[in-house]
């Protein structure tokens, strides 16, 4: 894929889920209009549970009011999951038409990015046939849920949402749900496997490098992005 245009990237720190969602939608419109390059957003969220487009409340192990974090229905694919501190979130805003990628090829590349990132921490991870995400044995270490949309009045097919990689996140949050709707599999993290967790921002740097390699892009930092409510903690 040599010759692809550069991809912008930004580390945003900790951002409320609703604010990050609004930012993605704005950037996706700008990308589809040709006003912005492909962009990789890297961040953490405060504790929040999210579901995909279909109702996944049957995968709650506790009543919603006992979760201890908000529950948000989104427009991505996939089932219920948790996001919180100690988890690296990556939201690529990419025009798949210009990249000449199908949706499943795109997802497979995201898995490859995660697997390569984990090798930086001496973790050998892989995929399980028929399931999305990245696994270490029978335990999921990274979830993927994406949306490919065509913003109104534009010709592009632009991605939003993305991946969540468990670095040092408190795995107790996952015990309150059937994570990703898969009852017979567990979850793990870099901390669980290595005994210690690197800073999430360090993992973000490693993932950015691997993203550039897998997608054949030069990665260019963005100094600032306007975030609604400006709730980022850097």
What residue ranges belong to the model's regions?
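Short, solvent-exposed beta-strand edge segments and adjacent coil->beta transition regions
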Residues: 87, 160, 185-187
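A structural signal for short, well-ordered beta-strand segments
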Residues: 90-92, 132, 144, 163-167, ...
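Short, conserved beta-strand/beta-arch hydrophobic-aromatic motifs that form part
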Residues: 53-61, 70, 144-167, 171
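Generic secondary-structure transition motif, activating predominantly at the C-termini of alpha-helices
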Residues: 28-32, 148, 211
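C-terminal accessory segment of soluble enzyme catalytic cores
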Residues: 152-154, 164, 169-234
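N-terminal lobe of the biotin/lipoate ligase/transferase fold
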Residues: 1-141, 172, 176, 197-198, ...
């Amino acid at each position: 894929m040599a010759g692809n245009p550069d991809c912008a990237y930004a580390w945003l720190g900790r951002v409320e889920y609703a604010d990050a969602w609004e930012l993605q939608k704005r950037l996706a419109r700008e990308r589809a209009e040709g006003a912005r390059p492909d962009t990789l957003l890297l961040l953490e969220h405060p504790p929040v549970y999210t579901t995909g487009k279909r109702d996944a409340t049957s995968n709650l192990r506790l009543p919603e009011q006992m979760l201890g974090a908000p529950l948000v229905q989104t427009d991505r694919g996939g089932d219920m999951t948790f996001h919180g501190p100690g988890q690296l979130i990556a939201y690529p805003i990419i025009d798949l038409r210009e990249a000449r990628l199908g949706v499943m090829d795109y997802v497979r590349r995201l898995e490859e990015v995660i697997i390569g990132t984990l090798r930086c921490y001496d973790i050998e991870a892989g995929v399980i046939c028929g399931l999305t995400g990245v696994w270490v044995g029978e335990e999921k270490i990274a979830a993927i849920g994406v949306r490919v949309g065509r913003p109104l009045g534009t010709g592009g097919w632009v991605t939003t949402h993305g991946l969540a990689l468990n670095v040092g996140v408190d795995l107790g949050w996952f015990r309150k749900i059937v994570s990703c709707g898969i009852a017979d599999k567990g979850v793990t993290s870099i901390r669980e496997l290595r005994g210690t967790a690197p800073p999430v921002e360090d993992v973000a740097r490693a993932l950015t490098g691997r993203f550039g390699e897998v997608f054949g892009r030069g990665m260019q930092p963005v100094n600032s992005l306007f975030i609604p409510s400006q709730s980022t903690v850097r």
